[in-house]
From Swiss-Prot:
Its EC number is 4.1.99.22, 4.6.1.17. PROSITE patterns: MOAA_NIFB_PQQE, RADICAL_SAM. This is Molybdenum cofactor biosynthesis protein 1. HAMAP family: MoaA_B (MF_01225_B), MoaC_B (MF_01224_B). Pathway: Cofactor biosynthesis; molybdopterin biosynthesis. S-adenosyl-L-methionine binds at Y83, G124, S175, M246. Isoform MOCS1A and isoform MOCS1B probably form a heterooligomer. Keywords: 4Fe-4S, Acetylation, GTP-binding, Iron, Iron-sulfur, Lyase, Metal-binding, Molybdenum cofactor biosynthesis, Nucleotide-binding, Phosphoprotein, S-adenosyl-L-methionine. Binds 2 [4Fe-4S] clusters. Binds 1 [4Fe-4S] cluster coordinated with 3 cysteines and an exchangeable S-adenosyl-L-methionine and 1 [4Fe-4S] cluster coordinated with 3 cysteines and the GTP-derived substrate. InterPro entries: Aldolase_TIM, Elp3/MiaA/NifB-like_rSAM, MoaA, MoaA_NifB_PqqE_Fe-S-bd_CS, MoaA_twitch, MoaC, MoaC_bact/euk, MoaC_sf. CDD domains: MoaC_PE (cd01420), Radical_SAM (cd01335), Twitch_MoaA (cd21117). The lineage of its organism: Eukaryota, Metazoa, Chordata, Craniata, Vertebrata. [4Fe-4S] cluster 1 binds at C77, C81, C84. It comes from Bos taurus. The active site is at D603.
Length: 633
């Protein structure tokens, strides 16, 4: 380890000669031209009494040595994932407030001198930063730094990896949440699945082993692909890392969307009973498993169900220069401001030491974390890449994919391995080819309506109203819109508590081959049928109380209407979701939205065919309210 810039004796004097107290709040900002220097916030006698082999400034009050630093190079990204950013978008930091290359290297140099031996570059998407290769090359010159890693979405990886390897990059994590090209495009709102697979292929070709693939598992989106991801490790030196879905500001975390480590493990063991656990490395965040005879392995990142705080050795620096000692904490210290105020190396170390000293024993747990205010993930780093819950896939879309995955799992795995061994760029998985033919869907629409009628409904810190009863009420055998004399009556919701209400409904329009082809190619004389239907669905949701006589008026905070073309049935699958905070549910708004979108699609196509059938108008799910949640199976 490199020599320490400040001796242990000097550090003891500094700690003993200054009194301090701490409330646990973030470090205050320095006055212009005058850096604020903080001392360690609590005594740590074991550091003063023993000759510590590791920097006192990077050792917290629980004895954890922080030897791993993650640096975000940018807040920007070349994908537009539905669950990486809040719906209202992310205001990017002005360029002048971001760390410069020299500031990044200055901080990295300081941390390495104190004992950090591993640095991982993150984002945003780090590979869109123009000087990323130069940064890696200069980091490689730091004495004592053993590992330089990068976490990327893989879009630019194949092109840049040869240069990065030459510069000194030693580890790669690639974020990929699905093996189905159509679903990939649905998730990230961009094409690029084959570029990601090409990047994985290039990493293997250049000798990186294992190549780590990060997959955030979310119920209703990709939990049905667990076995496909594991099958890839049979012939490829991959470490597929399944990550429990975690809450961040703006992603409306829902516990029901989290698939726990034990549930995932049970799923894998049903297919591979011989799955064996591997020894865990010290400070590892992953629980590793291997199937005998497979080249690669599988890991689980269990931040929510079984945290690993006791061995945490990680610190994070955001793109705007703030130090985060815990990924889930909202306390940050601006190292950038101290740097620009002219703080000396010793002063910077004391600021860092104060922040590390305040690090808690463990994070708050999954239920409390979901209520905490924190940065959106895109503004921290891309480690787990995309933590939000996207709109649920239409049930017919999801079920079609699941059937194909199960039917062709072995073929898909062997096809991928054959392609890798052959050195070619992997093509679309068999599952996608069977569902879509040889190409991706030509058209996909997704729209959002955000209303400021009730802005509080999206706040993760908004206190929940007390429930009217200790549990959900059973379904009633009485009609609530009929009074005791059998006459219609509007339900009085004035005494019901306000709660977050979400409902999803779907409809299917069986178009027939002629109308389907015209819509697919956007050749209808009336114009863009999907866009018109989409807009009609949004309008209908807002007007539901005027169409359904006894329906209450609801101040909707969000409406989303999606249309997918299903070529196997020559059909359009419509999904409408509505959200509001109030005393009554929004299932009627969702159902009306889906139904009117289907009617509008019929109207656009009726000149071509009157044999069109509107089918399967149904409620898919609802959450919130005294009667509990409903999810159609």
């Amino acid at each position: 380890m490199a020599a320490q810039p400040v001796s242990r004796v000097v550090r003891r004097v500094l700690r003993a000669g200054v009194r301090s107290c701490s409330s646990g709040a973030p470090v205050t900002q320095p006055c212009p031209g005058e850096p604020v220097v903080e001392v360690l916030s609590r005594p740590r006698p074991f550091l003063g009494e023993h000759a510590a082999p590791f920097s006192a400034f990077l050792t917290d009050s629980f004895g954890r040595h922080h030897s791993y630093l993650r640096i975000s190079l940018t807040e920007r990204c070349n994908l537009r994932c539905q669950y990486c950013m809040p719906e209202e978008g992310v205001p990017l930091t002005p360029k002048a407030d971001l760390l410069t290359t020299e500031e990044i290297l200055t901080l990295a140099r300081l941390f390495v001198k104190e004992g950090v031996d591993k640095i991982r570059l993150t984002g945003g998407e780090p590979l869109i930063r123009p000087d990323v290769v130069d940064i890696v090359a200069q980091l490689r010159q730091l004495e004592g730094l053993r590992t330089i890693g990068i976490t990327t979405n893989g879009i630019n990886l194949a092109r840049l990896l040869p240069q990065l390897q030459k510069a000194g990059l030693s580890a790669i994590n690639i974020s990929l949440d699905t093996l189905v090209p159509a679903k990939f495009e649905f998730i990230v709102r961009r094409k690029g699945f084959h570029k990601v697979m090409e990047g994985i292929h290039k990493a293997i070709e250049l000798g990186y082993s294992p190549v780590k693939v990060n997959c955030v598992v979310m119920r209703g989106l990709n939990e049905d692909e667990l076995l496909d991801f594991v099958a890839l490790t049979e012939g490829l030196p991959l470490d597929v890392r399944f990550i429990e879905y975690m809450p961040f500001d703006g992603n409306k975390w829902n516990f029901k969307k989290m698939v726990s480590y034990k549930e995932m493990l049970d799923t894998l063991r049903q297919q591979w009973p011989e799955l064996e656990k591997l020894p865990e490395e010290e400070s590892s965040t992953a629980k590793a498993f291997k199937i005998p005879g497979f080249r690669g392995q599988v890991s689980f990142i269990t931040s929510m169900s079984e945290h690993f705080c006791g061995t945490c050795n990680r610190l994070r620096i955001t793109a705007d220069g703030n130090l985060k000692v815990c990924l889930f904490g909202n306390s940050e210290v601006s190292l950038r401001d101290h740097l620009r105020a002219g703080a000396s190396e010793e002063e910077l170390l004391r600021v860092i030491g104060a922040a590390v000293g305040r690090k808690k024993r463990q994070h708050a747990g999954m239920f409390n974390i979901s209520q905490m205010k924190n940065r959106p993930m895109i503004l921290i780093e891309l480690f787990l890449m995309r933590q939000d819950s996207p709109p649920a896939l239409p049930s017919t879309f999801r079920n079609s994919l699941r059937v194909q995955v199960l039917r062709h799992r072995v073929s898909f795995s062997s096809q991928m391995v054959t392609l890798w061994k052959g050195g070619g760029v992997p093509q679309a998985p068999l599952v996608a080819q069977r569902w879509l033919g040889s190409s991706l869907p030509q058209r996909h629409f997704s729209s959002h309506l955000d209303s400021d009628a009730n802005p509080k409904c999206l706040s993760p810190t908004e206190p929940q109203a007390p429930a009217a009863s200790s549990g959900p009420l059973p379904d009633s055998d009485q009609l609530t819109h009929v009074d005791t004399e059998g006459r219609m009556a509007m339900v009085d919701v004035g005494r019901k508590p306000d709660t977050e209400r979400v409902a999803v409904a779907s409809a299917v329009v069986l178009l027939g081959p002629v109308a389907f082809k015209l819509i697919q190619e956007n050749q209808l004389k009336k114009g863009d049928a999907l866009a018109v239907a989409q807009l009609a669905g949004i309008q209908a949701a807002k007007l539901t109380s005027q169409l359904i006589p006894l329906c209450h008026h609801v101040a909707l905070s969000h409406v989303q209407v999606q249309l997918e073309l299903d070529r196997t049935r020559h059909a359009a699958v419509i999904q409408a979701s509505c959200r509001a905070r109030g005393p009554t549910g929004v299932e009627m708004e969702a159902l009306t939205s889906a139904a009117v979108a289907a009617l509008a699609l019929y109207d656009m196509c009726k000149a071509v065919s009157r044999d069109i059938v509107l089918a399967e108008i149904k409620l898919v799910s609802k959450t919130g309210g005294q009667r509990g949640d409903f999810h159609r199976t």
